Structure formats: C-alpha cells, structure tokens
C-alpha cells in the first residue's frame, strides 16, 4: 500500500481560513441561486396570493424535475477535486468535458418531463386558482434546462479547482438581469406585452442563459491566465469516465430527489389545505431555503476540500476539512434559528400583509428554527462524504428518514389528526432531525477510520 502523507497538524485557525476562503464565495453563489426564485415570487406578489402560490409551486415542481440532471453532475465534485489535489489538471479538464456532454443529453428529457408534470396538476387536486397560472410559468421555465445544466457542469469544474469568484459574479449579474426582465415582462413595460406569471418564467430563462455564457468565457480566460492546458487536453467523449461520473452522480441525484420529492409532495398536500395554507407554507419554506443555502454552500466547500486532501494523500487532512465545514455550518444555523424565532413576522412581511398567511407562516418558521441545526448537519456531512466518493450513504439515509418517517408522520398529523399544515411541518422536521444524526454518525466513522489508517502507515 502507498504511504499516506501525514503533514504537521494545523491549528483550528489554519483549518478555518481555507474553508472560509472557499465557502464564503460558494455560499454567496448559493444565495444568489436562491434569490432568483425569491425575486420571481416578490415580483408577482402584487398579482395576489394565487400568484405567490403558483410561482412557489411551480419552482418546487421545476426543481423536482431538475434534480436528476443536477444531481448527476455533482459527481464532478469528486472527480475534479481529487484530480486537482493530485495535480492532474488534464484529468480535471477531461472530467469537465464529460459533464458538459452529459448536461446536453439530460436537458431535452428534463424539458419534456416538466411539461408532463404540469398536466398532472388537476389530477393532484390542486386548486384551479393555483393550477391555472402555474402551467404557463412552468412551460416558460422549462426552456432554461439546457443553459442551467451547462452552467452546473462548468460551475462544479471551476469550484473544484478553487475558482469561485467567476461563479459568484455570474450569479449576481444574472439576478440583476432577471429582476429587470421580470419588471418588463410581467407587467408589460418598455412597450412589450404584459405576460403576467409567464413573464417571470421567461425572465429566469434569460438570466440562466447569461450565466452559462459568462461562465464559459470565464473558464477560457482562467485557463489562458494559468496555462492550465485546457486546449491541449483530450476533450473527446470518454465512456469509461462518463460511467464513473454517472456512477457517482446517480446516488447523489437520488439523494436530492428523495428530499426534494418529499417537499414537492408537501407542497401538494399544503395546496389541498387551502390558498392561505399554501401561501404560508411557500413563504416559510422559501425563507428556510434561503438560510439553507449557507450550509449547502459550505457542503460544497467541504466536498472540495475533502476531495483535494484525498487526492494529495492526506487522509487526516480530509477528516479535519470535513469537520471544519460542519462546524462553520452549525455556527450559521444557530444564528438563523434565532432569527426565525425572534423576527418571524418581519421576515414574512416581505411577501405579504395578509393576516391569515402571516399567522400560519410565523408558526411554520418556529418549527423551522428547531430543525435548522440538523438540516445543516445532514447536508454538510453529505458533502463531506461526496468528496470522499461516497454518495450512496446519504441516498439511503434520505430514503429512510424522509419517505418512511418524515412524510408519513406529516401526512398523518395534517389530515388524520387534523393538525393542518403545522402537522405537516412537524412530520417533515422529524425526518430532517433523524437525517442529521445519521449522516453525522456516518462521517464520524469515516474520519475515525482515516485517523487509524494514518497512524498505522509510515509518514512521507
């Protein structure tokens, strides 16, 4: 067996600095990603609660369809970060190329699936006042799959090589474009026709097209500055590498699909409880999702740093990188939980002043405050495991805690016990809490094993 690199143990501050250097831009990128959906919701707010519910439901359904393609491309985190840690830049470029080819192959079936999902809305018992406007919004949004998947492939490639600022700039500028396009297309300014909710969907398409174009140019310019050898690499389709990428990505896609699928069904259940319940559910969920973007971004930083450490043969360093990512995420989650408890109505008033919706949303934010720490733990631990090449453990965890515990308990409390949308959220939070505990345990076992292996091997 090859000797394991055992460097001097860095101080906690020494671990924190590189984690934050990577995590902060990635977190801001994740927030920028979420802001695009928030902007859509805010911009249609004057159209009424039905419009808020329709855009919220449409975004959840879109991301349910999007999850498979997005998740498969997460395999690039493992391949590129480990190759970069080992100093094999050509391997990074070749993996990126396979990701781009795969993104092209995934876009068309994803678009078709989006249209099929919209045809199911009446059969799912969705209020016609919500189902009607949801359909044109999703139809427009479906055209963003191709630029979206291309952006994801380029983003994972650049981030795994510690290139994060270009990704952040792409998101910030795309949000500005999306905001302006919403103003023009929803309400018919500058002489263009008033498209209503559909205009919000088309605005997002425009923003995502800008993102992939910006990132493609950024990748080329970065390679020229660093003489990274992108144009000298063999970028032809590589079926062996493609199979490896898919093998890593499919469980990651299933992990995401299982969680997003639960919240998609939760939105459907909330819609059956009435317009006010759905609006409160969507606003509270969107606020919780905004704060979730921080640990989600930290999880990417954890995956990259763990993968890079493994690539250079530093298993103890991989363990320390993963634990530092979890610590950073928990610190933030503590603050967001406190904010939800202390300022619920102030946060919800961004969306609406409807008293019934505010009351429901405030109660749901109190529940969200409880599961913040566990939700942060589960997503960051899953990222750490992904950096190590383990995408199956998080997938199996999500299957059990969400589909065999969280959703059944939520449905029972909401409909059988008559607790409504509050009962639904209590069930979902149970699954999130269990998921955090299970994945924390899985990561702890792996980190202990690495320490033991390092202690039994000669240092180099």
List each language-model region with its residue ranges.
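Interfacial/gating helices of multi-pass transporter permease domains
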Residues: 21, 44-63, 129-133, 197-198, ...
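Transmembrane helical elements of multi-pass membrane transporters/channels
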Residues: 21-40, 140, 151, 174, ...
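Residue-level hotspots within the lipid-embedded alpha helices of multi-pass solute transporters
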Residues: 30-34, 67, 107, 111, ...
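Helix-terminus/linker motif at the lipid-water interface of multi-pass membrane proteins
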Residues: 31-53, 122-128, 184-195, 253, ...
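Alpha-helical transmembrane segments of multipass membrane proteins
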Residues: 38-42, 119-120, 153-157, 180-187, ...
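Small-residue-rich hydrophobic transmembrane alpha-helices
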Residues: 52-115, 151-162, 166-167, 280-343, ...
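Short runs within selected transmembrane alpha-helices of multi-pass transporters and secretion channels
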Residues: 73, 77, 141-159, 167-175, ...
């Amino acid at each position: 067996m090859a000797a394991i690199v055992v460097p001097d143990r860095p101080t906690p501050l020494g671990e924190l600095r590189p984690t934050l250097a990577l995590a902060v831009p990635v977190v801001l990128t994740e927030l920028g990603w979420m802001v695009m959906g928030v902007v859509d919701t805010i911009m249609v707010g004057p159209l009424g609660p039905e419009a808020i519910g329709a855009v919220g439901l449409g975004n959840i359904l879109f991301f349910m369809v999007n999850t498979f393609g997005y998740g498969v491309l997460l395999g690039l985190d493992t391949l590129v970060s480990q190759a970069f840690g080992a100093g094999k830049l050509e391997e990074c470029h070749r993996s990126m190329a396979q990701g781009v080819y795969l993104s092209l192959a995934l876009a068309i079936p994803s678009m078709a699936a989006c249209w099929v999902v919209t045809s199911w809305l009446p059969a799912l018992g969705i209020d016609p006042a919500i189902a009607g406007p949801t359909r044109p919004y999703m139809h427009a949004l479906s055209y963003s799959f191709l630029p979206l998947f291309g952006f994801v492939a380029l983003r994972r490639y650049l981030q795994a090589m510690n290139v994060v600022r270009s990704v952040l700039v792409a998101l910030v500028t795309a949000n500005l474009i999306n905001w302006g396009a919403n103003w023009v297309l929803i309400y018919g300014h500058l002489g263009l026709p008033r498209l209503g909710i559909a205009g919000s969907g088309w605005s997002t398409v425009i923003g995502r097209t800008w993102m992939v174009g910006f990132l493609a140019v950024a990748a080329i310019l970065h390679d020229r500055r660093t003489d990274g050898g992108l144009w000298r690499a063999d970028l032809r389709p590589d079926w062996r590498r493609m199979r490896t990428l898919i093998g890593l990505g499919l469980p990651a896609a299933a992990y995401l699909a299982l969680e997003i699928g639960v919240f998609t069904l939760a939105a459907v259940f909330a819609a059956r409880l009435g317009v006010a319940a759905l609006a409160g559910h969507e606003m509270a969920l969107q606020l919780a999702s905004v704060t979730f973007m921080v640990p989600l971004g930290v999880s990417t930083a954890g995956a990259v740093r763990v993968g890079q450490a493994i690539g250079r043969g530093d298993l103890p360093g991989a363990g320390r990188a993963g634990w530092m990512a979890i610590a950073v995420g928990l610190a933030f989650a503590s603050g967001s939980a406190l904010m939800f408890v202390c300022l619920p109505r102030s946060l919800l008033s961004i969306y609406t002043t409807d008293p019934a919706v505010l009351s429901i949303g405030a109660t749901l934010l109190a529940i969200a405050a409880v599961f913040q720490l566990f939700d942060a733990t589960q997503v960051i631990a899953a990222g750490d495991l992904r950096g190590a090449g383990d995408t199956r453990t998080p997938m199996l965890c999500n299957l059990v805690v969400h589909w065999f515990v969280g959703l059944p308990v939520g449905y029972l409390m909401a409909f059988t016990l008559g607790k409504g949308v509050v009962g639904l959220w209590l069930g979902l939070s149970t699954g999130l809490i269990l998921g955090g505990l299970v994945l924390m345990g899985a990561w702890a076992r792996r980190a202990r094993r690495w320490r033991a292996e390092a202690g039994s091997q000669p240092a180099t």
